[in-house]
Amino acid sequence: MSADPTLIPASPSEDDYVRQVREATPPPLLSEEDPFALFAEWLEEAGKKEPNDPNAMTVSTVDADGMPDSRMVLLKDFDARGFVFYTNTQSAKGQELNAHPKAALLFHWKSLRRQVRIRGTVEPVTEAEADAYFASRARHSQIGAWASDQSQPLPDRHALEKRVAEMGLKFGLGKVPRPPHWSGYRITPVTIEFWRDRPFRLHERLVFDRADGGWTTKRLFP
């Protein structure tokens, strides 16, 4: 028995498909003028939705052989000058950034289905900036910065705990100064790309490129 052709739904027309896509997608990105304002807006939204560390970001560098290296760190500050994080400057990432002062950042907010990719040049923050941020850290974190030879071989967990205890005794109840090997890096972006999920994998990509002291924008195919 053949099927009744009247019971088989007709394939949607091109106009029907376009209408479905438009009805299912959110409005376009609001700002195409200031990437930092748009980033601040997205970060604020992430702070309300992400269960942990909405300021977490991947920092990608290259080593002496050109081999890429990535790790998660926490964004601690940003403004029109760039994006700042703090670390042990003798760590693997610190040495790589000192030798090759360029980096890529990636923010991925799964709860929002959004990501931001940043590429730029790197420079150390000022001594005053590093001192101010270190002073704001919890005391145990300050002591940990002295105790950990970050990225160096560790014989066992006890060795680290012993170092922490030794540093705790050394500083007692007094102020813990910032270690000379602990500071921050600022990534000054040359490119910032905002990506937002849309139905049917027709995602939205908006790219800001630095040019003549300002920004140019372009959209990319998903």
Swiss-Prot record:
Disulphide connectivity of cysteines: none
Reaction catalyzed: pyridoxamine 5'-phosphate + O2 + H2O = pyridoxal 5'-phosphate + H2O2 + NH4(+); pyridoxine 5'-phosphate + O2 = pyridoxal 5'-phosphate + H2O2
Residues the record lists as binding substrate: 76, 133, 137, 141, 201-203
Cofactor: FMN
EC code: 1.4.3.5
Keywords: Flavoprotein, FMN, Oxidoreductase, Pyridoxine biosynthesis
GO biological process terms on file: pyridoxine biosynthetic process
Single annotated GO MF: pyridoxamine phosphate oxidase activity
Presence of keyword Cell membrane: no
Annotated metabolic or biological route of this protein: Cofactor metabolism; pyridoxal 5'-phosphate salvage; pyridoxal 5'-phosphate from pyridoxamine 5'-phosphate: step 1/1; Cofactor metabolism; pyridoxal 5'-phosphate salvage; pyridoxal 5'-phosphate from pyridoxine 5'-phosphate: step 1/1
Residues engaged in binding FMN: 71-76, 86-87, 93, 115, 150-151, 195, 205
Transmembrane helix in keyword set: no
Summary of subunit composition and partner proteins: Homodimer.
Task performed by this protein: Catalyzes the oxidation of either pyridoxine 5'-phosphate (PNP) or pyridoxamine 5'-phosphate (PMP) into pyridoxal 5'-phosphate (PLP).
Similarity comment: family membership: Belongs to the pyridoxamine 5'-phosphate oxidase family.
Name used for this protein in its record: Pyridoxine/pyridoxamine 5'-phosphate oxidase
Annotated source species: Caulobacter vibrioides (strain NA1000 / CB15N) (Caulobacter crescentus)
Gene label: pdxH
